[in-house]
């Protein structure tokens, strides 16, 4: 919860809430195991690949790390790999790991477009462009983007439509009271 995040700032979730961490980790492990059983190549975030500068990235704005929910930091829509711009600066460290996984794929297939959303201002202005992967659900050429005021911003929805072009229709879905669409 938000109050606990403020009092325990910078501490690993394993220390602050071991039961929650264990449950999330177990769920991720189960999903990975199931996908591997279906011959899906599963890539997991490994924070150990980050160098010291990457680990310290934006620490002066928000302490901590969040390597449990990598989908919030990027999304794949068709042949578009999109680095997101999240409201929580600590999530931006994920992009360094994801780049190491996805960038080589763009070299293998020139039809893949690798796009990075503009990085938000560290002063958190209301009109900043935020786009979060956990707010995005794709159904063919229809892209649904949750808008709660806690994640993706209206300007993020507009930016996504401009990046995807006329081949996709982006719908903004009001999800007040929820954190993310998925």
Model-inferred region functions:
Residues 1-182:
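The feature marks the mature, well-folded catalytic cores of soluble enzymes
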């Amino acid at each position: 919860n938000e109050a606990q995040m403020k009092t325990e700032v910078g501490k690993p979730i394993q220390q602050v809430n071991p039961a929650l961490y264990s449950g999330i980790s177990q769920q991720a492990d189960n999903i990975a195991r199931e996908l591997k059983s279906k011959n899906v190549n599963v890539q997991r975030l490994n924070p150990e690949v980050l160098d010291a500068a990457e680990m310290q990235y934006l620490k002066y704005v928000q302490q901590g790390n969040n390597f449990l929910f990598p989908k919030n930091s990027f999304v794949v829509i068709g042949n578009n790999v999109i680095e997101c711009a999240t409201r929580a600066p600590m999530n931006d460290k994920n992009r360094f790991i994801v780049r190491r996984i996805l960038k080589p794929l763009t070299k293998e297939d020139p039809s893949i477009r690798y796009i990075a959303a503009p990085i938000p201002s560290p002063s958190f202005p209301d009109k900043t462009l935020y786009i979060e992967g956990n707010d995005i659900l794709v159904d063919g050429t229809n892209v649904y983007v949750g808008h709660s005021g806690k994640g993706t911003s209206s300007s993020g929805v507009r930016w996504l439509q401009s990046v995807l072009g006329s081949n996709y229709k982006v719908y903004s879905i009001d999800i007040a009271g929820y954190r993310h669409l998925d």
